[in-house]
Amino acid sequence: MSNKDQEIKEEAPVAIEDLSNPVVVDSYNAAGIIANNAIKHVISKCVVGALVVDICQYGDDFIEAEAAKTFTKRKNLEKGIAFPTCVSVNNCVGHFSPLKGNTRTLKQGDVVKIDLGCHIDGYIAVGAHTIIIGNTSAESMTGKVADAICAAHYALEAALRMIRPGKTSNEVTQVIEKISDMYGVTSVSGILSHELKRFIIDGEKVIFSKNEPSQKIQTYEFQENEVYCIDIVMSTGEGKAREEADRPTIYRRNLDSTYKLKSKASRDFKDQIVKRYSALPFPLRNFDEKVSKLGLVELVEHQVLAAYPVLFDRSGCEVVQFKTTVLVLPNGNHKLIGTEFPLPFVRSEFSVTDDAIKALIASPLKINKKAAKKASATTIDVKMQ
């Protein structure tokens, strides 16, 4: 692309906010590159003895710095963190992004989930990856953690290929469940994969990781030009996420709230949130501690802000996570995050045994139109019960 072409794209107004607009696709791709690189750099900081809070701050700073370098000719363009850097260890399911002064460090053998996101003009790319601290042995790791890593990886790859026009959200859920059963691990309850829209990180269309009797599940058919965050979280334990002693440190604005704040401190804090993060999630750590403490209580009490609770499975189990953002394009799906991350060096005694799911995982994300015309009768079809 020439500099002139780049200038035209940077200055082009965005009227259509879906993938039929090339400017929107460019924004998603730019956000994906930054988020992808952020995870790679955060992985390099995850060593024995490293402070988790320092790693999280490094990830946030990296995203902000890289986003500031993009689309510089488009004035007043909002860009930066779409989801704060979280480093959730062992049985912590997610949302661990501690405040300054937290002393948690990484230890040899810790199962570490890195989760973060970037946006350009509200177009969001989020991703997560799991590593094992010190997993550099010449011999592959085996056992339940290895089983969970393999299950989560293959479930993500299968879901990536199923989110296509004509397929439904419930079909994806069933494939995720089948794969977790094959590896003898558990999808964590309450984990949802969401449709993404401009400045909306948790769209109305969702994909459940497992079907549960207590859930009211609405089935959606996927459409061309949609964008989804696929979030796969597997546990070696019972897969029931719960809150423990750690208080939430990540919040987002509740756009449905009409409450008029009474405290000046609360109003000032809200103004800072809107200016820096719009409607997207933010970490308390990135605000002055006095300002956030004074303003937070009223905002939370009256549901002006919604919290992301720090969640845990039971003690003694391990939780793994792989997450990416997928663009559902006419010529196939485009995976924004995670294409270059090496998996932990693990080996499972289990495998994907369903022939249709194996064929699905082995199939390309991009559609070969010539091959598709010749082989329309042999389209991969994962049978559901």
Swiss-Prot record:
Gene3D superfamilies in the record: Creatinase/methionine aminopeptidase superfamily, Winged helix-like DNA-binding domain superfamily/Winged helix DNA-binding domain
Entry's Gene Ontology cellular component terms: phagocytic vesicle
Source organism, top-level taxon: Eukaryota
CDD domains: PA2G4-like
PANTHER family membership: PROLIFERATION-ASSOCIATED PROTEIN 2G4, PROTEASE FAMILY M24 METHIONYL AMINOPEPTIDASE, AMINOPEPTIDASE P
Family, per entry: Belongs to the peptidase M24 family.
Protein name: Proliferation-associated protein A
